[in-house]
Amino acid sequence: MQPPSSEERTVTVALAGQPNVGKSTVFNLLTGLSQHVGNWPGKTIERKVGVHHHRRDGESCAMRIVDLPGTYSLTANSPEEQIARDYVIRERPDAVAVIADAASLERNLYLLAEFLFLPVPVVLGLNMTDVAERQEIRISPRILEAALGVPVVPMTATKNQGVGELVAAVDRVIRGAIAYHPSRPAIREDHRAVLEEIRTLIAGQVPDPYPDEWVALKLLEGDAEITRLMRERMQERWEPVRAVLTRHEDALLAVASGRYEWIGRIVRAAVTRPRAGQITLTDRLD
């Protein structure tokens, strides 16, 4: 992997997404031969890092691209999920580019929702738009961007379309050239007071580099790693937290329901699908 020259300003960008969304294609287009393949520390999971060089206003710039394992969530139920969330929280890349399948936007927005709670700006690469178009799924990037509060870039990576625009959007977010005000999903209304109670109980106890609100949500979700971390950290002060979590064992459903309600509102606003029974272009071609 060719290192950036001393004259280049280098930023680090994590490339994230669910499996089979074209993330590897994007990574290869961005880095070409300037990549290194190894394993994540202590894991047998492949770790790919590359460098993308570009110019902005005559200035030479370099992006160090870290290809995170494909994951459906950041719940740490698998080594891939553990790696993805630990990297973003502990290493704090300058930005995360989340690659999504435009034809399965609802499913992909769940992972995006989790990244929005982490302390790193996010850009959404809406990939496989050609597949969505063949299925006559119409997505308004402008409405989607307004609803999410993050930059949205339509892409068809297999045709190298939109990849340069993704780099430009990530660059602008990192430089603060565009406003970044993400719209995060709220927990279901009947559990918002519970979330606030947990946040109050753990205030001042959350170790760096973990965000307080994210830790509170993970405790409500029953995340094993975060529960163990906070129990060991708080020791005798853990008991009130444990009591609240025990009384509200259904909180995981409240967190998930809040996210699905948020996803539903966004999709209804930004996505148009063929009417029930309507024959799509894909059907006609088949």
Over which residues does each language-model region extend?
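Conserved G1/Walker A P-loop phosphate-binding module
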Residues: 1-76, 90-91
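Solvent-exposed alpha-helical segments within well-ordered globular domains of core cellular machineries
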Residues: 28, 50, 66, 82-86, ...
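Conserved C-terminal guanine-recognition region of P-loop GTPase G domains, centered on the G4
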Residues: 50-60, 83-153
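Gly-rich Lys/Arg/Thr-decorated short loops/hinges at beta-loop-alpha junctions or inter-strand turns
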Residues: 62-69, 92-93, 124, 241-246
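Active-site glycine-centered loops adjacent to acidic/histidine catalytic or metal-binding residues
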Residues: 67, 127, 156
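Switch/connector loops and helix/strand junctions flanking conserved nucleotide-binding motifs
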Residues: 73-75, 106-107, 131-136, 160-165, ...
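Canonical P-loop GTPase G-domain recognition
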Residues: 130-186
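Extended helical scaffolds that flank P-loop GTPase cores
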Residues: 149, 176-286
